[in-house]
């Protein structure tokens, strides 16, 4: 095996309390901390572990987004990726368009594995990996909680409603990662400094010749409804009375 391609999406940091714009057209991102999508960070960690075991020789991180996404790619390089590719786009790229972009990069890079987070924490679409596998006409294993490689095959364990399911797939393939797969490494200052010298290629999205036309339109964003304050009751009888008063029971 030679190469692993890893997708890194730029998202609002999971510790940030997201605010909806007053006009409901989106969320406030000005001055907000941005980070690597946590599921993608796990995908990168798994790729690095595979390389460290000698099952891959190169890890390439890819991001589709604005010029500022270079920050997240540099973080990926600091974690240990060998090089980075930014497909620059100032507009939102939907899952199908993202899958088409990855397919173009696959034609150029010829990876054995494409590792993606199972979903982004911003839109929670959970679609790009599946769409990419279909376009590439290669096997897929989603929600991976364990990945084992054996030559030209991968054995992937995934959590399903009934318990655990283990799939064996031929490579090349697409694998999407769940939070239980691993714990990403901590990036130290020397690695951050080294990452500045690693190659980062920028490609204009228009140069790929990919149809990125929007397939749907977001009508409005609404913040979650405010929760009413809880009511303390002394005993079961008082609880029953309160539920009857609200018409929840008869």
Tell me the role of every PLM-derived stretch:
Residues 1-250:
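N-terminal glycine-rich FAD/FM-binding segment characteristic of electron-transfer flavoproteins
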């Amino acid at each position: 095996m030679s190469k692993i391609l890893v997708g890194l999406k730029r998202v609002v940091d999971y510790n940030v309390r997201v605010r909806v714009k007053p006009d409901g057209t989106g969320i406030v991102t000005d001055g907000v901390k941005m980070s690597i999508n946590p599921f993608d960070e796990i995908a990168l960690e798994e790729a690095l572990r595979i390389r460290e075991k000698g099952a891959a020789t190169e890890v390439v991180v890819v991001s589709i987004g604005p010029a500022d996404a270079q920050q997240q790619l540099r973080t990926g390089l600091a974690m240990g990726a060998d090089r980075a590719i930014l497909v620059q786009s100032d507009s939102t790229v939907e899952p199908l368009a993202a899958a088409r972009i990855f397919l173009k990069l696959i034609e150029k890079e010829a990876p054995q594995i494409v590792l993606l987070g199972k979903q982004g924490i911003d839109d929670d679409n959970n679609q790009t990996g599946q769409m990419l596998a279909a376009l590439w006409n290669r096997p897929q294993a989603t929600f991976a909680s364990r990945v084992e490689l054996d030559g030209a095959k991968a054995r992937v364990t995934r959590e399903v409603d009934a318990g655990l399911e283990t799939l064996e797939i031929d490579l090349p393939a697409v694998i999407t990662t769940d939070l239980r797969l691993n714990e990403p490494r901590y990036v130290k200052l020397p690695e951050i400094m080294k990452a500045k010298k690693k190659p980062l290629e920028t490609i204009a999205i228009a140069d790929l010749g990919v149809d990125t036309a929007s397939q749907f339109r977001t009508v409005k964003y609404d913040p979650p409804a405010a929760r009413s304050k809880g009511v303390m009751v002394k005993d079961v009888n008082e609880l029953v009375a309160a539920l009857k008063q609200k018409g929840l029971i008869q």
